[in-house]
Amino acid sequence: MCWRELLYMLPELYLLGSAMIALLLGIVVDARWVHRLSAVSMGVVVVLSWWSGVTDHVAEDVHLFNGLVLHTRYTCISRMLVGVAGFVASLLFLCARREVRYEFSVVMLFATLGAMTLVQAGHFLSLYISLELNSLSSCVLVCFNRSSERASESALKFFILSALSSCIMLYGISLVYGYSTGLECNVMQEILAGRASLGATLGCAFVLVGVLFKLAVVPFHMWAVDTYHGSPMAAMAFFLIVTKSAAILLLARIVGENGILQQSILYGIISVSGLSALVGELGALRQSNIKRLLAYSNIGQLGYVLPVVVLHGTSSYAIFHYVLTSWVINAWIFSVLLRYDDEGFELASLAGMHRSSPFVAFALVVSMVSAAGFPPFLGCWPKYFFLKSIVMSDIPTVVAFPYVLLVCAVGIVPCFYCFRIARVVYFDQPAMGAGHPALPHHLGLTVIAVVCMLLSVIALFLAQYFDILFQGLVWVFGGRT
C-alpha cells in the first residue's frame, strides 16, 4: 500500500471520517446540526469523486490494495453516481425536517459508504464486506422507529433473509474459489462467458442470487414489500435511490463488457426478469398502501432493466440512463411523500388533496405517471431503450419474443393504479368529518419537486442524445468505461 492508493480512495476516506465525526458530535450538539453536517459531507464527497475521476487518467484497469479495489473509468463514474444518489437522499431527509435521533444521518453515511465501495470491489472479500456494511446499515434504518411493531417486524424479516442470502453468496464464492483458485471478481466474467466447469458456473449463480436479492428480483422479493412498508419514509427513499442504483451498477460490472454468454444463467435471469415484471405490476394493482404500491412498482421495473444488464454489462449506456431517470422520478415522488407521517399512509388519506395542496397533488400524480412509464413522460424512455436493445440482440427469437410480449402486456397495468391515484386525489371526497388538513409547508421539498419537474422536461428532449452526452462525460473522465 502506498499514499497514491490512499489518494484514489479519498472520497471514501472523507466519508468515513465524516461519519465518525458526526457520530461523536451528536453527543454534544443538537441532532439538526448532525443532519446538516451529513448532507454537506455528502456534497463534498460528490465533489471529491468528480475531482478524482477527472484528475486520475487511467488507461487500463488499476488494482489497489492487492486487488481489493478496482479503479477504472466505469468504477469512477459509478462511484460518483452513487455519491450523487446519497447526496439526493440526504437532501430529501434534511428538507423533510424529521424529528429523529442524530444516528439516522450517521447510519445513512455508513450505508452510502458501503454502496460506494461496493461498486469498486475488485475482490470477493471486499465485495462481501461492502455488501454487508450496506445491508446492516439498512437494517438499522428500517427499525429506527423502535416503538413501531411493524418496523421491528420488517427489520427482523429483512435481517433473517439477508443472512440467508449472505450464506448463499458465501457458498457460491467458495465454489468459485474451489474451481478457479481465484477470488478476483474478474474470474466471474470468464466463468459467465462459458469457459468453466459446472461447479464454477453454479458458484457464479449463487453469487448472482445475493445481488438479485439486494435488488428484490422475483423470487427473491418477499422481504421488500413488508420491509418498505414498515421502514421510515426517508429510509425507503434511500433504498430506492442509493441501494438500488449501487446493486444495478455492481451487477453490470460483474458481468463485464461482453455480458453473460453462459446460456443457462442468461436464460434464467431473463425468465426471472419476466416474472418480476408480471408479479410487480400485478401486485401493485392490488395495493391500497402507497409504500407497498411503490415497492411492487419498483420490482416490476426491474423486469425491464435486468436483461439489458446481463446482455451488455458495462458496454450499455442505457443502464446509466435508467439510474439517472430513477433518481429524478424517486426524488420527485418522495418530495411529496415525505410531507406525511411515516406510519400508515393509505391511498384513501389522499382524498381531496387537490383542494388543500394543489401543487402537491399535481406533483404526486405526474411523478407516479412518470414512474409508470407512460409516453411521453420521463419513465417511458428507459423502457423503450431496453426493449429496443432486447429486440436487436442475438437472443434466440424463441426466448426474446415471449419476454417482449409479456413485458409489453403487463406494461399496460400501471395505468390502472396511476389513474386510481389521480381519481382519489382529484375526485374522491374525504371521509365523513375527516377533511383533508393542509400539509405543512416544506420549502426544501417544494424546491426539490420543482427541480425534478424541470429535469424531467429537459430529459424528455435530451433522451435520444443520451449516448452522446454520456460519451462526453466519459471523455471528461479521461478515457472509456
Swiss-Prot record:
GO cellular component terms listed in the entry, alphabetical order: plasma membrane
GO molecular function, one term: NADH dehydrogenase (ubiquinone) activity
Transmembrane domains' residue ranges: 9-29, 39-59, 76-96, 104-124, 158-178, 205-225, 232-252, 265-285, 293-313, 318-338, 359-379, 399-419, 443-463
Broad EC category: translocase
Top-level taxonomic group: Bacteria
Classification via HAMAP family: NDH1_NuoN_1
Entry's family note: Belongs to the complex I subunit 2 family.
Protein name, per record: NADH-quinone oxidoreductase subunit N
